[in-house]
């Protein structure tokens, strides 16, 4: 029975989490509609509040009908439904990737707003097989070819309880229960490589899919038993991350690890230092690895970071001037700025703006800044790093740069910590 398989999966994935709330992402397609009905049964049995989230990407005429249909199903099940909208701003470059990131941003932000810790998605067995083929075409390594049934995004746990259930079983379940769903016409378009792979797999013999699943399991096992522990050791031994939001990599210690792990370390640092959520592609990281082997000092930019070799160390800090962080008003007690720093005010102040240091502001306060400590820690790269730090302004005046203990008056009311909003499935343990 499908439900029994689903129940076994979700109980194993969630464990003893003690949840009272959970959310499910539903588009209106067969996979997510089946997930909604299965999750509803499970939530009723376990007395858990289930919320339903739909995201309209505003790319197809049918999408609004799909959202309306999901809303009707949710109402019939007495479940709260939230309809979100992705604004593509008429920018169609790299649209699939941007739409995916936008979708997860919207859904996880909603989860955070309502204290929901877990989001269910409808990735099923066929999706895993297709992903494996796509990544194999891109020459992905062990980490890229591996799969996970639990991921993290924006500090929300993303769980995939259909991971070992083929699409055919989900469709059969819906048909047997007389449940309708929508077909996304883009799934039949040759415009997308995934669709071409799906068609080839459908025409192939059943043993091909079985062999891919077996290879996936072997890779996952290799990752869990060899490469994940090596990655954790490498980060502990070779990486130093500083409160100023930059990092040093010890290249002597770094050299002893496998190439697979080296790529992941560089990507790990690029993500947390840049404040981005997505990893750089291997072809972008590879030139840096080659430069490291040449044993010469260099300075490059990659993934929103400056990567600079200084003797036997690699310095990585945020690139200033490219995609500058947004200014934010500190209305609550604390706020995350640039996806990297948590700023907390210890007492009531007039509305403060958290932003970056402009050249004009720097010239005004330059003589009052004590950068000695930052200079020592960063091997004299203090001026560049200074412009990546959060500053606090009131009425366009810089009143504080907490990292370097600069305050315009005696009231030291702010605390700043480096708290990048990123969790890796390779370094996080539930």
Curated annotation (Swiss-Prot):
Where does it reside? Cytoplasm
Q: Name one Pfam family in it.
A: ATP_bind_3
Q: What class of enzyme is it?
A: ligase
Q: Which reaction does this chain catalyze?
A: cytidine(34) in tRNA(Ile2) + L-lysine + ATP = lysidine(34) in tRNA(Ile2) + AMP + diphosphate + H(+)
- GO CC, any one term: cytoplasm
Give the keywords, sorted.
ATP-binding, Cytoplasm, Ligase, Nucleotide-binding, tRNA processing
Provide a Gene Ontology MF annotation, just one. ATP binding
Would I find Disulfide bond among this entry's keywords? no
What is the protein's major site of localization? cytoplasm
The family database entries (Gene3D superfamilies) matched by this protein are listed as:
HUPs (3.40.50.620)
Residues at which ATP binds:
27-32
Provide the family line: Belongs to the tRNA(Ile)-lysidine synthase family.
Write the protein's name: tRNA(Ile)-lysidine synthase
Species assigned in the record? Rickettsia akari (strain Hartford)
